[in-house]
C-alpha cells in the first residue's frame, strides 16, 4: 500500500485555474447564491445529471451498467474529519473531463454559458459540473473529487481554491463507477454534518430528484444481549471490560429454582451494551407526483400534495395536471385554492405560488415571470426540461423558453376555469373568491380577453338572486336589441332602483348590474361581447330601438321643450355641458349622464377615494355632465309652463338648481357644496309645513351665522312654490 501511495504521488499533476475563477466565485456568492445551503442542491443535481447520462447510454448498451446496476446518490456526513461526502453511481469522469470541467473555467463561466445557450446548445452538456460545482466552496475549505469512468482509471481531483488544483491517479478504495465528492467543511459550516440539517435541505431543494438519495448516519443504540454474547462483545471491545462487574448479579438471579428458568433466560438478556451502527434513510421517497400519469393519481394524493406544497388546511377546489412535449418539454401541476388569501393583491409581499423546478431540481418559489399577476392565486409546480439549472432572475426575464411556458400555463388555467364553470356550485365558490382576478385579466391580458369574458358572471335585471353569464344574456336578447346594456354602481339595490334603468327595463331589455369597483376598469377594455357592443345606460348617446311613432313623439318633445332646455342651460351655466330631452327616464324628472369617454359617476367616486390620485387626470376625466329631463314628468311639464310664462321668474331658477343638485345625488355624483343644498331642502320643508321664514329669522337674529345662506330665490311667492310641488 505505501508503494501505491508513493506511486500515486508520482502521478500528481498541478494545473492553474484560469483567471476567471475569482470573478466566478464572486458571481456565485453574490449573484446566484445568497444562501449557502444550495451547494447541496447543486452537487445533488450534478449527481442526478451524471446518472441521467449513464442511464441514457445504457438504453443502447446495457453492458455500461456492469460496473454497478444501482443508480443512486449517497450522502455520508463524518463529524470526526469533519467531511461531507456525496457519492453517485453516475457516468463518472475521465482524466480529460476532470481537467476540462473542473479547471477550465471558461467552459462553465457565465459568458460562455449564455453564448452556448443562444447558439442552441444542449444545456445539460455545458460543463459536466457547470457553475454549480464551485458553490461547494461556500462551505468547504478543501474539495476532493474521486471519479471513475468506464473508459478510464480512477482519478482524484483536489483543490483548496488557491488558484490551482491537482489531478492524480487514485489507488484508494475502488468506487466501481461514478463520482465521490468529499467536502472538508469550514469550522463555521459544520451544521451540514447534522442529520436534521441535511434532511431539511434535501427536502427543500431536492425532494423530487428521480434517483434515491440515501443519508448514512453513524448512530449508537443499546443492545440487549445474553451473558455469552456479552462475553464475546467484551473480547471484541476493550471498553466493555468495565461492565464485567455486573455479571455476578445476573448469575445470582440465575441460581433460582427450575420453574423460574423462563424468567432467568429473560433476565439474562437484560444486559445492555452500546453499539455503533450505520443508519440508512432514503430522503426522497415522495416521487414527483407531476411526473406520474394523471390517470394513476387519486384525488387524495393530489390533496395531500397540495397541502404539503401550500400548507393550506383545506383541500384545493380544482386541479390541472398536464405535460407539454415537442420542441419544448415541461410538466405542470396547477391548483385553485378554495379561498383567496387576505393579501392577494398586496404587491410588495413576496408570493410563493408556483415552484419552478428544472429536471426535478428546485430552482425558486417566487418566479414572477412564470404567471401573470391576475393569476397570482394559482398554486403549483412547473418542471422544465429545457431551462439551465443555474439560471438567475435576470436570465429568466430574458428567457424565450419561459415565455412559452408562461403562455401555456395561462392557456391551461383558462381551460381549468372553463371546466370548473360546468359545475355551477363549485364555480360559484371560485367566482366569489377570484372574480376580481378575472376582471383584472380582462383589463391587462388583451390576448385572452375573449375567453376571460366568457367566465364573467353578473346579476341582471332578469336574473333574480342567481348570477348569469354574458353568453346567457345574449341568448335572451330581443330581436331588435343590438347592444348589451349595463350599469355600474355600489350595490345591486342601488343600481336596480336607479333612474337610468327605468326606460330600458320598461321596454323589456335586460340590464347587467356591475357592482364591483374593478368592473369600471374591466368595461373600459371590454368593448364588445359576441359581436354585441356594451353600452352604459349612464352615458350619453343611449339609443333604444324605436318605432316610427316613438320617433315622432320624441321629435315633438324636443321642439316643445327646446325653450326650457336653453333656459336651464343658462341657469346652470358651466355646471353642465348641455340640457337635453331624455329617452331613458320613466318616473324620474331628470338625471345626469356623462360623455361617452369620460368617467361614470361610480368611476369618479372610486378615483376620488384614491389616496395617491393624479389630480391632473381628474381634471379632464371627470367628464362634462349632461342634464337629461323627462318630458312626460309633471314637474318638468309645470316648469316648462312657468318658464314660458316668465323666463325671469326667480322660483324657476331656484327650482332648476334644486332639480340639478338632486339629480346629481340620484345619479351617483357627490355635491361640491352639500351644505347649501341642505339649506335649500330645509327651506322647502319649512314652506311645506307652513312655517313663516320671517319668524325664524327674527329668533335667530342674535346668532350671527358663520356664512351667509343663499336666499331661496322667489320664496316670497309661497303659493307658486307649492303649486310646483
Curated annotation (Swiss-Prot):
Q: Which family does it belong to?
A: Belongs to the heat shock protein 90 family.
Q: Where does ATP bind?
A: 46, 88, 107, 133, 393
**Region Disordered: start and end of each range?**
220-271, 697-725
Recorded name of the encoding gene: HSP90AB1
* Subcellular location(s) of the protein: Cytoplasm; Melanosome; Dynein axonemal particle
What top-level branch of life does the organism fall under? Eukaryota
Reported regulation of activity = In the resting state, through the dimerization of its C-terminal domain, HSP90 forms a homodimer which is defined as the open conformation. Upon ATP-binding, the N-terminal domain undergoes significant conformational changes and comes in contact to form an active closed conformation. After HSP90 finishes its chaperoning tasks of assisting the proper folding, stabilization and activation of client proteins under the active state, ATP molecule is hydrolyzed to ADP which then dissociates from HSP90 and directs the protein back to the resting state.
- What is a single cellular component term in the Gene Ontology annotation? plasma membrane
Q: Which organism is it from?
A: Gallus gallus
Which named protein is this?
Answer: Heat shock cognate protein HSP 90-beta
